[in-house]
Amino acid sequence: MISNIGIIKGLVREFYQTRMVVRIDNDDLEPFFLTKGKLVAFDCEEFDLWNKPYKLVCKMTQDKLESLCVGCKIARVLFLVFQPTGHELQMTDMESLHLVNKSFETVTWGIGSWHEDSVRLVTLVEVVSQ
């Protein structure tokens, strides 16, 4: 059985099509997933932070989520922030967001300053069958 970690690593590698690999601590990530849930889709955005305020804002509409998860109940949404370091993507922050009655809030990170000029935000949607 493929673990959630394996799925994430494979999806992100396939998405980027680069030499970068994803380093994720299994202990950090696994508690954010429901045991009966599964990942069905993810979205990725790159943010240029060079000479700009170090703040990251993610906005996801309910329509977009529903289009990604047709026929499934959304259990949880997980946001991962990756910082490029050499040929790796180091996970620097994450947030797990429960959806209640189809409500969805904006998630904002204060990233702090570093020498890299961009970060990537990966949005993972965990669902359970209806």
Language model features with spans:
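Tubulin/FtsZ superfamily GTPase core signature
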Residues: 1-130
